[in-house]
Amino acid sequence: MADSAELKQMVMSLRVSELQVLLGYAGRNKHGRKHELLTKALHLLKAGCSPAVQMKIKELYRRRFPQKIMTPADLSIPNVHSSPMPATLSPSTIPQLTYDGHPASSPLLPVSLLGPKHELELPHLTSALHPVHPDIKLQKLPFYDLLDELIKPTSLASDNSQRFRETCFAFALTPQQVQQISSSMDISGTKCDFTVQVQLRFCLSETSCPQEDHFPPNLCVKVNTKPCSLPGYLPPTKNGVEPKRPSRPINITSLVRLSTTVPNTIVVSWTAEIGRNYSMAVYLVKQLSSTVLLQRLRAKGIRNPDHSRALIKEKLTADPDSEIATTSLRVSLLCPLGKMRLTIPCRALTCSHLQCFDATLYIQMNEKKPTWVCPVCDKKAPYEHLIIDGLFMEILKYCTDCDEIQFKEDGTWAPMRSKKEVQEVSASYNGVDGCLSSTLEHQVASHHQSSNKNKKVEVIDLTIDSSSDEEEEEPSAKRTCPSLSPTSPLNNKGILSLPHQASPVSRTPSLPAVDTSYINTSLIQDYRHPFHMTPMPYDLQGLDFFPFLSGDNQHYNTSLLAAAAAAVSDDQDLLHSSRFFPYTSSQMFLDQLSAGGSTSLPTTNGSSSGSNSSLVSSNSLRESHSHTVTNRSSTDTASIFGIIPDIISLD
């Protein structure tokens, strides 16, 4: 009865998490509020629970109140199958934890850590509760030096046959270990970090090879009743796939009691898998930086360049059975990780390629996220298998201006340059003189080419006949700005004058007269420049007179202007008149045309009597062409070339 009352008091003092563990251990429903869970646990005691459940209650109570000193009577084991058993346990049977000659009793140890004597007394619990220490080795972590082994690799075993399982572990620290952890504290940042850490690792229970970190499914860890943060879940690659955590070592230093008298407890809960067993271990490690790992890699030495040359010859050896043979290999001097020039070329011994990557970038990337995968072939490239290539170190030393090289069949190499550069540099250099001579030749050749291009641009042949289309494509190269004439009135500049009849089409308002008082006449005369042009050919169809004519937004065809100039060749007064071409340059240009002579086209009236006016509007020309014009005087309307169909109407 005393034991029942004591167990009832223990159950009444448990929290929700302990009650859920107890009910789950007993195979009862563990969902509900605290009073519901407490009622279920008390009904379990009243119905008569098994000795294993009673021991679970005491274990949970000891974890709930770890500072309470348990008497040997509290650790008494009830009878199993009505077999006689000792009522109490002597202090000699309580397991001891020894660390460097400092014995200390651990009242927090679960029943699973009792001595072999009690294992024989509990035959039905031996296989489930006894922690197995198989010969399991975990892979060495490059960024951590192993200082001590706090808990050896131990199988995750539970006396619960359900899918969701839980087990408890305990360990204690020695004064030396406490001193190492305390002295490595770094409080420079926002968070307190330790260089010497207590590290928790999980792996599969396999002894074939060193095991990688592998978390059990639905893992949950509590250190000294405080939940431990685990790595976040990875996003699933497929729909419906359960997300998994990346398996990494867990740093539990901040949750560990830095004391030599009070042990630390670790409660692990997980979901059991059929055909898979897991193990855990706790280590005391020292964290390293990427700089230390790089120094250790350099301390290993540089691999002999002859090894790489032998590998090149092996790859480029022709296979007699194959019709395709590799005669050369191209290798980049840029790191595939950072796309920068290599500084410390390295690769793994397990890689079959010649391409190297930069050791500094590779180690720094794995410091942030340890994957240790070769960036060239995507195979495993652990730190222990990295080597520095001596051949690439020589290439980087002598080839400073090239980012790609080519290996030949005999093991030699040559830099690969672009077509614009001089391709005279190889593995054996020609010296300074050769470099200077090639540079001078290149400069002379480039200067000669540039001078030839300038000459071609400066020469323009105006005697060659060209079509009007070609002239319209390049008008800027052949057109010149006409000079101002002091004798021509400025108010008529750029406007065709029709003395008797204005154009019926008015696109823009009339331009106002410009005040010429501020213009110096001497400057205008100096601005005029004489024309030195060769005689124009007889065919005036290809000439463009439009740049010299600007009407009130009227556009005239070049063929019409050419025909008009040919028809009035006998009338010199019209050519020299300022009403038709007010610019001096235009007069000089047309003087040469009239002097050279041109073929005159027949007029509609058979005479030049209609040449009194300069030009007519597009409406009058269209009416003249259609022969619908009524009686008009020749002084009012100028009838010019009604048979020419090249007039474009802008109405």
Swiss-Prot record:
One GO CC term, this protein: nuclear speck
Sequence repeats: 520-523, 557-560, 598-601, 612-615
Top EC category: transferase
Domain PINIT per the UniProt entry, residue ranges: 124-288
Region of interest: Disordered: 465-511, 599-632
Processing after translation: Sumoylated.
Identification of the protein by name: E3 SUMO-protein ligase PIAS1
Organism of derivation: Homo sapiens
Underlying gene: PIAS1
